[in-house]
């Protein structure tokens, strides 16, 4: 199972990736 820190990092990456895709 992924650690809480990894899950938080993954979630943050997803939140950043979505806006970037919308800009493109």
UniProtKB/Swiss-Prot annotation:
Induction, as annotated: Down-regulated 6 hours following staurosporine (STS) treatment and up-regulated 24 hours following STS treatment. Down-regulated 6 hours following beta-carotene treatment, remains down-regulated 24 hours following beta-carotene treatment.
PANTHER family (alphabetical): HUMANIN-LIKE 4, HUMANIN-LIKE 5
Example GO molecular function: receptor antagonist activity
Keywords recorded for this protein, A-Z: Cytoplasm, Secreted
Annotated tissue distribution: Expressed in testis and brain.
Role: Plays a role as a neuroprotective and antiapoptotic factor.
Ribonucleoprotein in keyword set: no
Organism for this UniProt entry: Homo sapiens
Protein location: Secreted; Cytoplasm
Name of the protein: Humanin-like 5
Any single GO BP term: negative regulation of mitochondrial membrane permeability involved in apoptotic process
A Gene Ontology cellular-component term: extracellular region
Pfam family, one: Humanin
InterPro entries documented for this protein: Humanin
Family assignment from sequence similarity: Belongs to the humanin family.
Zinc-finger is among the record's keywords: no
